[in-house]
């Protein structure tokens, strides 16, 4: 088959559904390269640029993560995989080419090496969903960043943080799995978007939460 190396700015072709909003899937970062702002936005400097110190260079493959923006009508979902701190900042400064989003897949399981406040403050998500583990991710620094992001109205977690720092958890109704690993049922967080892209629902079907 054909092998393609994706780069920032590439669009991923997807089959469209007749009568529904157009789904656009755009790679916004890959191999530490980031998408360029539109020509008419190059002078719109991000006021958050430089507001948070950089961290030591990340030499792991996490910094090379592929970040993807899904646009479906007016709905926008950001998934940056394991992208780390300095590249997150590079993605939205000195100009923010992403704009405002609806749902943010919390980067890198909620580890402190990711989820730069500059990124969160720039894209201003309404909802965050953290794919953390019972003891992995959901670090105090990331949890504090999410709490401090004024645009966020609901913070979902796939697992409850069962470490000693249990204060770093969202409310129980927004957590899919609350037991230890041996008792975990693998409940999931579901996102459904209306065909016109004008509304969406986040739910945990196993708990009847929506």
Describe the residue ranges of each PLM region.
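Active-site-adjacent alpha-helix of alpha/beta-hydrolase-fold enzymes
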Residues: 127, 137, 142-154
């Amino acid at each position: 088959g054909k092998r393609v190396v994706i780069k920032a700015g590439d669009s991923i072709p997807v089959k469209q559904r007749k009568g529904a909003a157009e789904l656009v899937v755009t790679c916004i970062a890959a191999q530490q390269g980031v998408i360029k702002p539109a020509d008419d936005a190059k002078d719109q400097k991000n006021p958050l640029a430089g507001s948070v110190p950089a961290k030591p260079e990340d030499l792991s493959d996490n910094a090379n993560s592929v970040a993807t923006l899904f646009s479906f009508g007016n709905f926008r979902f950001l998934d940056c995989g394991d992208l780390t701190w300095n590249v997150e900042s590079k993605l939205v400064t000195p100009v923010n080419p992403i704009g405002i989003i609806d749902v943010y897949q919390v980067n890198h399981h909620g580890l402190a090496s990711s989820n730069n406040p500059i990124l969160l403050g720039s894209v201003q998500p309404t909802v965050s969903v953290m794919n953390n583990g019972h003891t992995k991710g959901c670090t105090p620094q990331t949890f504090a960043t999410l709490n401090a992001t004024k645009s966020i109205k609901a913070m979902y977690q796939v697992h409850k943080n069962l470490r000693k720092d249990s204060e770093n958890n969202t409310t129980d109704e927004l957590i899919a799995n609350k037991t230890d690993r041996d008792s975990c049922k693998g409940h999931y967080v579901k996102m459904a978007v209306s065909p016109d892209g004008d509304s969406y629902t986040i739910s945990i079907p196993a708990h009847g939460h929506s």
